Amino acid sequence: MTDLRDSIFNYIIKSMEKNKDSYFLSIDQGSFGYEILKKKFPQRCINIGIAEQNAIGIASGLALENKIVFVYAISSFIYSRAYEQIKLNLCSMNLKVCIISSGPGYCYAPDGPTHYSLDDINVFNSLPNMKVYSPYDDKTCKQAISDFVNSKGPAYIRTDKGTFYQHSNSVLDVTHILKGKKNLIITHGYFVNLFAQKFDLLKQKKIGLVAINKLKPFNDSKLINILKKYKNCYFIDDSWPNASFGLYLTSLIHQRNLKTNIKII
């Protein structure tokens, strides 16, 4: 078991140790890992304050000077308050800035609907050049950070709070964690952890489980080869039904004329 945010910060710290031209901007957002990062890199770790648009503007300027930039913010605020800056500054110019979102979905539900983040995947998937990740264990956190650092352009990484199970066979894009017979569950991020707690029941019912880390660009062919083995698949996550990644999968199934039935939950 590992804390997902601690894992993300651990690999950001390792990346910043290796890449001296990297910076970390916090939008008045803290965590245990952030405190460690501040002590290690006091000159490269900046708290911008509650100013999402300014943070993206500053990150863009740093990226234009060939810096690698991480921006840490609450999910619901970063994409709603700074959408224009993300779209025009980061995406249109394909700048190397990684947005680390804290509290996607209903993670901060006790704080009320202002903190719900139920359409972030839909928003970021629609942006050009943007890579989207939803890691679910230590290995996929490492893969997400590494993939961003070693490629061009912006990225968005969802990070939920809490401890998560580890999966030895996790890969960057699509992982067939558990093989089933007729029915398949497809999910990502936090929900992989929920179903991991019910592995014995899934095995008993012969229900397969696919975990997705990299949502965009998506490995269509890999999932298609898995879907061909199942009669029914169920996509489950914490998005609005009309803003779900499941809509993309539905379109994919119909475009490829697969016989697999899909239901979005």
Residue ranges and their predicted role:
Residues 1-163, ...:
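Thiamine diphosphate
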